[in-house]
């Protein structure tokens, strides 16, 4: 009985729902008859009634299809896959490590250009950087990596720099091997209107070092994203960043700025057409112009005249130098020249380029230097940058300068960074870590063959919270035969060995006569080692295996110092381990008449060189001197038997970007020639001084700029020459010098 009631109740409910459904449909049809309205086909987008009040920025069909005149993501992916068939390449699958495990090590070979080959200015600079690097080889059998002689920088078919038939030509290379162990440099790919990443030839298994690289097509751990740079970008050296001249206050006159082209149609126009929305003419200046290209007047809109007029009111360089943040939107391609300009100016880049694989993203932590925005959230950018604190602003700006100086200021640095990244992948067991790449002085100046431990370098003591060791090794450069126990070198040995910080003494014997027996040397409380210098002046800076301490005291055989002077200089060096600390100063200057650099030993109010005849420095600079500097500079030093100390100062100043440190008041640090017999000391020869003038100009030419920095301060001991008891002074002997 109860079951029957349940079924009856269920049936009644079902009937009610059916009647309600039909009643609702009847009401809708009656309303249509009364209002004379017909049923409409459902639309995916609303049909606004107030169309006159809403300007059409895009057609409704474009919105339904995803917007933009370019191909769909699927079409772009298919086009990429058809050209780059090895899209899954990784170092383990598409690179022959066996070519790099030979005795030659990591060597790079450049294919010789064919007769009459057209090479653009930018690609010529790249080839020059490779050929002048320490990795270049002219023998392809020694090569680990290959670089094409064919210009592949500009693959826009409408460009005058476009080189046709690349695919056929590279397949004719006997060493091409489907691109394995090759690196291809490219700045521009694709052409109007879609600017796809089509290079016009199959790169195969080659590593692609490309600007404006899309994350969809980037092969992680294999390809390398490089910055877009102009043909005017300097070959080497390059200008320093501008933060040193404009560091305080952290916030500048303008909060955010952009000044550039506005694309009226085509890819990249969506973002740049919307930039005027954030312009307020006060602390945010966003200026665009339609006046570019041949047909801009055909496509100009109602806003062009006003934008062009506003565009002329502001100077780009003034905005760049006086803005805290710089907007870096995408152009036709993902990369932009604005990126490097912002880095140099210490104007924090605010990126609006969705899908852009940032330059050298494998090793650079870009969140420490840029603000990444979203093209779809342009209106949120002002509030985002306003929320960045002052301490964060200063940190970001400082990091822009670190990255600019280390990797982007010249074509040389861009190319060498590319090669060093590949080298780290090949020799991963001795590769650099992220701190080495992102902290001063940068990865190019940290050679992992020296050590993989941060504590072994002079740059990371503050990062690690430690101090250098309490011992040093003295290296004495000897060029005169030992004929008397009263020679200056005998006195010097006694003075140095009395220092409680001296671990050992190494005599680098560069005399024509063979070194004397051990019994001829005076007894000392520290180990004494005599090493053959092979009669090469540059050998005093070779990385001798016997040097185990971090600090090296470099001395000439005729140097005159007190033990207390050595101890004080060593204490000062422990506070400046990345610089040269010592006694004899020299200086450089620019001669406007000769239009060349000059060198002077006069006592002036400033100095830029500390001679290594009496100076402390870190032993890592021996490794840099031998493995970073080109052999041509070391050969120049050996040929002239001169300038090795100037070259070491150039090297250390280029690494530290700081001047050396002069200690105490001593000016004369050598025995006078009359006390050494009839033979005149080399430094007393006028020809010796002339050679040093020439060396300064030769070295600055190789570095591409003048790395030496002037300083006007000297460090003396506390209580130096104060009217207090000598018993309270630790270095009282320094006052009698």
Curated annotation (Swiss-Prot):
Glycans are attached at residues 194, 322. Residues 28-737 are lumenal. GO terms for molecular function: acetylglucosaminyltransferase activity; glucuronosyl-N-acetylglucosaminyl-proteoglycan 4-alpha-N-acetylglucosaminyltransferase activity; glucuronosyltransferase activity; metal ion binding; N-acetylglucosaminyl-proteoglycan 4-beta-glucuronosyltransferase activity. Pathway: Protein modification; protein glycosylation. InterPro entries: Exostosin, Exostosin_GT47, GT64_dom, Nucleotide-diphossugar_trans. Its EC number is 2.4.1.224, 2.4.1.225. The active site is at residue 645. Keywords: Disulfide bond, Endoplasmic reticulum, Glycoprotein, Glycosyltransferase, Manganese, Membrane, Metal-binding, Signal-anchor, Transferase, Transmembrane, Transmembrane helix. It catalyses: 3-O-{[(1->4)-beta-D-GlcA-(1->4)-alpha-D-GlcNAc](n)-(1->4)-beta-D-GlcA-(1->3)-beta-D-Gal-(1->3)-beta-D-Gal-(1->4)-beta-D-Xyl}-L-seryl-[protein] + UDP-N-acetyl-alpha-D-glucosamine = 3-O-{alpha-D-GlcNAc-[(1->4)-beta-D-GlcA-(1->4)-alpha-D-GlcNAc](n)-(1->4)-beta-D-GlcA-(1->3)-beta-D-Gal-(1->3)-beta-D-Gal-(1->4)-beta-D-Xyl}-L-seryl-[protein] + UDP + H(+); 3-O-{alpha-D-GlcNAc-[(1->4)-beta-D-GlcA-(1->4)-alpha-D-GlcNAc](n)-(1->4)-beta-D-GlcA-(1->3)-beta-D-Gal-(1->3)-beta-D-Gal-(1->4)-beta-D-Xyl}-L-seryl-[protein] + UDP-alpha-D-glucuronate = 3-O-{[(1->4)-beta-D-GlcA-(1->4)-alpha-D-GlcNAc](n+1)-(1->4)-beta-D-GlcA-(1->3)-beta-D-Gal-(1->3)-beta-D-Gal-(1->4)-beta-D-Xyl}-L-seryl-[protein] + UDP + H(+). UDP-N-acetyl-alpha-D-glucosamine binds at residues 432, 540, 556-558, 644-645, 692. Residues 1-6 are cytoplasmic. Disulfide bonds join 643-695. Belongs to the glycosyltransferase 47 family. Glycosyltransferase required for the biosynthesis of heparan-sulfate. This is Exostosin-1c. It comes from Danio rerio. The gene is ext1c.
């Amino acid at each position: 009985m109860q079951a029957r009631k349940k079924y009856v109740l269920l049936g009644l409910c079902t009937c009610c729902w059916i009647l309600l459904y039909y009643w609702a449909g009847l009401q809708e049809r009656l309303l249509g008859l009364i209002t004379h309205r017909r049923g409409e086909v459902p639309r995916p987008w609303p049909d606004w009634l107030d169309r006159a009040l809403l300007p059409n920025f895009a057609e409704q069909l474009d919105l339904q299809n995803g917007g933009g005149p370019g191909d769909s993501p699927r079409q772009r992916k298919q086009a990429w896959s058809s050209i780059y068939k090895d899209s899954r390449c990784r170092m383990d699958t598409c690179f022959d490590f066996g070519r790099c495990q030979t005795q030659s090590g990591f060597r790079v070979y450049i294919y010789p250009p064919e007769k009459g080959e057209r090479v653009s200015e930018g690609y010529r600079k790249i080839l020059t950087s490779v050929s002048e690097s320490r990795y270049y080889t002219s023998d392809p059998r020694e090569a680990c990596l290959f670089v094409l002689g064919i210009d592949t920088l500009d693959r826009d078919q409408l460009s005058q720099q476009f080189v046709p038939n690349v695919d056929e030509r590279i397949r004719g290379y006997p060493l091409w091997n489907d691109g394995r162990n090759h690196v291809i440099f490219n700045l521009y790919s694709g052409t109007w209107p879609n600017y796809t990443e089509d290079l016009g030839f199959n790169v195969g298994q080659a590593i692609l070092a490309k600007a404006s690289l899309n994350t969809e097509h980037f092969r992680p751990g294999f390809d390398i994203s490089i910055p877009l740079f102009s043909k005017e970008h300097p070959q080497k050296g390059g200008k320093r960043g501008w933060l040193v001249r404009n560091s305080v206050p952290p916030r500048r006159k303008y909060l955010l700025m952009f000044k550039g082209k506005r694309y009226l149609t085509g890819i990249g126009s969506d973002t740049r057409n919307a930039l005027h929305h954030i312009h307020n003419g006060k602390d945010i200046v966003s200026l665009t112009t339609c006046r570019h290209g041949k047909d801009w007047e055909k496509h100009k809109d109602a806003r062009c005249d006003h934008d062009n007029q506003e565009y002329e009111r502001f100077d780009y360089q003034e905005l760049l130098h006086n803005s805290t943040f710089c907007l870096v939107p995408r152009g036709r391609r993902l990369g932009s020249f604005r990126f490097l300009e912002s880095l140099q100016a210490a104007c924090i880049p605010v990126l609006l380029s969705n899908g852009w694989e940032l330059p050298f993203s494998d090793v650079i932590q870009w969140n420490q230097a840029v603000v990444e925005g979203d093209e779809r959230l342009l209106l949120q950018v002002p509030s985002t940058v306003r929320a960045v604190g002052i301490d964060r602003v200063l940190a970001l700006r400082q990091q822009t300068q670190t990255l600019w100086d280390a990797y982007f200021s010249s074509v040389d640095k861009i190319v060498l960074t590319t090669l060093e990244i590949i080298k780290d992948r090949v020799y991963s067991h001795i590769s650099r870590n992220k701190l080495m790449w992102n902290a001063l002085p940068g990865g190019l100046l940290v050679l992992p063959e020296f050590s993989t431990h941060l504590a072994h370098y002079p740059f990371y003591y503050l990062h690690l919270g430690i101090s250098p060791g309490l011992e040093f090794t003295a290296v004495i450069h000897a060029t005169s035969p030992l004929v008397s126990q009263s020679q200056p070198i005998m006195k010097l040995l006694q003075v140095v060995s009395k220092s409680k910080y001296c671990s050992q003494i190494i005599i680098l014997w560069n005399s024509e006569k063979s070194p004397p027996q051990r019994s001829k040397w005076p007894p000392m409380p520290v180990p004494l080692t005599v090493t053959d210098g092979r009669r090469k002046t540059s050998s005093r800076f070779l990385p001798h295996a016997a040097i185990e301490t971090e600090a090296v005291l470099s001395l000439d055989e005729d140097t005159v110092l007190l033990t207390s002077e050595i101890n004080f200089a060593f204490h000062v060096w422990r506070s400046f381990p990345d610089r040269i600390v010592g006694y004899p100063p020299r200086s450089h200057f620019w001669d406007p008449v000769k239009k060349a650099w000059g060198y002077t030993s006069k006592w002036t109010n400033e100095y830029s060189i500390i001679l290594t005849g009496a100076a402390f420095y870190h032993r890592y600079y021996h490794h840099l001197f031998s493995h970073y500097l080109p052999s041509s500079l070391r050969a120049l030093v050996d040929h002239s038997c001169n300038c090795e100390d100037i070259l070491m100062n150039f090297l250390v100043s280029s690494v530290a970007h700081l001047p050396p440190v002069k200690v105490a008041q001593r000016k004369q640090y050598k025995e006078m020639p009359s006390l050494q017999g009839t033979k005149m000391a080399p430094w007393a020869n006028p020809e010796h001084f002339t050679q040093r003038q020439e060396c300064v100009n030769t070295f600055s030419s190789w570095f591409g700029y003048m790395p030496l920095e002037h300083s006007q301060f000297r460090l003396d001991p506390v209580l130096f020459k104060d009217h207090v008891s000598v018993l309270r002074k630790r270095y009282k002997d320094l006052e009698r010098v």
